[in-house]
């Protein structure tokens, strides 16, 4: 729950921009080239533009935003993108309103308040590793907080590794003329995660409080090889194969978590 600061009387509109960015990774091992292609096909179907649109529509509802417009696209050979423009203000139905135009407040939001997702399935050419990355951005202007959607987004995707960035920009002015550069209390993105998620993930923070920049990265605590094997069971593998695959997967997870190559 986002805890607001004591209610402020504002001069005009709340001009604070709040942006939450996710990089969510799913890691998998598929032994053959054919299995890796089937993994890509599976991910491409599971997270196509229609499914992503539903997830982002749910996000808009969770944060209390109104949807202005939806653009979505599936790509060949793989991947998908969805962009939703949102606003705080209710949307006027032009069919019902005749020639009535959407209010200036709504139009003013269109370049600032949005939810986007892009997906990137890929595979290693030799070692059997396959990954799926979803990049999600929720940017709002006004009192709407993207932090309300944190838990839903993590639970909606196959989240082995999650990298999150949250920042607040701009200012809003109260009726006495004083500028306010943030309108809610926060010292870590972790403040807004559920107990269930916190219990399952290792987390690491890098925060720059004076700049209103908050960064949290996390990965699953428990490693269950069966959860990472595609179309295979660990019990069907030899001990040597299990150790090799486990080492490859753990290295991949560490490299994605730290954002650099560790084996070189």
From Swiss-Prot:
- The domain of life for this entry's organism is Bacteria
Pyruvic acid (Ser) is found on 113
Q: Where is the active site?
A: 113 (schiff-base intermediate with substrate), 118 (proton acceptor), 141 (proton donor)
Q: How and how many cofactors are bound, per the record note?
A: Binds 1 pyruvoyl group covalently per subunit.
Site label Cleavage (non-hydrolytic), positions: 112-113
Query: What are the annotated GO cellular component locations?
Result: cytosol
Could you give a GO molecular-function term held by this entry?
adenosylmethionine decarboxylase activity
Known InterPro entries for this protein?
AdoMetDC_fam_prok, S-AdoMet_deCO2ase_bac, S-AdoMet_deCO2ase_core
Give the family, as the similarity comment puts it: Belongs to the prokaryotic AdoMetDC family. Type 2 subfamily.
Reported function:
Catalyzes the decarboxylation of S-adenosylmethionine to S-adenosylmethioninamine (dcAdoMet), the propylamine donor required for the synthesis of the polyamines spermine and spermidine from the diamine putrescine.
Entry-linked HAMAP family? AdoMetDC_2
What name does the UniProt record give this protein? S-adenosylmethionine decarboxylase proenzyme
